[in-house]
């Protein structure tokens, strides 16, 4: 099998399947999930064997940036629910209205602060807070791609997605 030049959980079905399977196994491995949830940085995640299961499965089919994937794994440990029928990007989920409110689930100010983040460890903490604001229910492939490929292009895409969905002020 030829190795893909880059990893994408939204564009490559095989990589998406590996990530989903790995995440679903959390339900049967509460100790592993708890170990990942206690980590405060990608550097700490490197010491968790459960992370390496994901890394080793993915490295067979695509080039993997270990630190970026570690951030994905750590943040994924905070995801409680994955609605596979959800076709919205993570940024659109952030912009969706709170139940019974005209306010977005993630405020405009918090979203703009997120887009200003360049430091990987700061991104890690910010995204854990975002997952919590979303009630732990997110689109897993979209979240994973955004974290893995955190750069200007990702930020731009997220901005367009968020502001396409966000309630407008009159």
Where on the chain are the PLM-derived regions?
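Basic, alpha-helical nucleic-acid-binding regions used in initiation and control of genome expression
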Residues: 2-5, 9-170
């Amino acid at each position: 099998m030829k190795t893909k030049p880059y990893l994408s959980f939204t564009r490559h079905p095989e990589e998406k399947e590996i990530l989903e399977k790995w995440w679903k196994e959390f339900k049967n491995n509460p100790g592993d999930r708890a170990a990942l949830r206690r980590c405060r940085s990608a550097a700490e995640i490197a010491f968790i064997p459960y992370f390496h299961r994901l890394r080793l499965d993915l490295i067979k089919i695509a080039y993997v940036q270990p630190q970026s994937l570690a951030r994905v794994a750590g943040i994924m440990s905070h995801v409680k629910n994955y609605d596979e029928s959800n076709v919205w990007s993570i940024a659109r989920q952030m912009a969706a209205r709170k139940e019974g409110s005209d306010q977005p689930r993630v405020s405009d100010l918090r979203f703009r602060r997120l887009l200003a983040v360049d430091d990987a460890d700061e991104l890690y903490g910010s995204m854990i807070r975002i997952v919590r604001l979303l009630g732990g229910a997110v689109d897993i492939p979209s979240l994973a791609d955004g974290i893995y490929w955190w750069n200007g292009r990702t930020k731009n895409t997220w901005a367009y997605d968020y502001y396409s969905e966000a309630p407008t002020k009159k």
